[in-house]
Amino acid sequence: MKKNLFYFLLAALCTVSFTACSSDDNGDGENGGFTELEHIWSLEPTVMYDESGNVTTNPDDAVKYTGSVQVTWDCPEGTSLEWGEGENKMQLPVATIKQLVENMGNANLASVLKSVEFKSNGQIVAVYKDAATTSTANDGWKTASDYATYKKVNNNQILVFLNTAKVTEGMEADEKAALTEVLKIFKDGIPVNIRWSANNTKAYFYIDKAFVTSLLDNQTLKAMLDSLANTDAETNSTVIMIKAIVNSAKDVMNKTTKFEAGLELMQ
């Protein structure tokens, strides 16, 4: 199996853990028609802190980053996620995962994502760069449209629908086939929760525990992994690893009392 397939399968677990939330909605809703949402949304400023907890402007001194990427993960102290298999198996404490996600996300996201616009016709448009850069120049930014649309469920939730053909455009055949299978998991839309600030100029787009739990029990994902299990030795090893991560994650989520992960954006 191509190594990229492993990353696609793993990304199926990780990506939605930070881009969607749970819902029993059947996909009904209105395209656009969400005045509060129909704006261009930008990232929160990134703030760096040193070991003493003081704000710093020197990345070499930074040990903590805050900004748009925000995670709440409440579970018993010492709860860990198992990663890897055999001699390579290791325990990653939930507290460490939370801090890593926030630090890495807030340190790097602003260099590849400038803004997200929710248009009145239901289109989602992002301004992005292909690769991270430390340059503050305005060059290099691109506009991505037709990759996703949204429907309003209520004032605190939207459904996001991915355009599979556009997302997989230009990929090698095996990579395209693999990612297409992964995206079938989200064919009914990705429900995204929204928590508004008092004046609606900030919005926190997040997932919760219920969705992560439902994803880990997703029958399409299970069937896909089972179908790949005996393809060849490398594939089988990868499938075993992913199943182990899924099983460990189920145990962790059973112990979790509150989980929210997402992006806080501002007008």
Q: Residue spans of the language-model regions?
A:
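Edge beta-strand at a domain terminus
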Residues: 73, 145-149, 156, 211-267
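Tryptophan-anchored aromatic micro-motifs
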Residues: 32-89, 265
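Bacterial Sec-dependent N-terminal signal peptides
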Residues: 2-8, 14-44, 257-267
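Flexible coil/linker segments and helix-coil junctions enriched in charged and small residues
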Residues: 58, 67-92, 135-137, 171-181, ...
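N-terminal cationic amphipathic segment used for targeting or macromolecule association
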Residues: 9-10, 18, 124, 135, ...
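Terminal low-complexity, poorly structured segments
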Residues: 1, 5-9, 30-33, 211-212, ...
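Contiguous, well-ordered beta-strand patches that form the walls/edges
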Residues: 48-52, 82-215
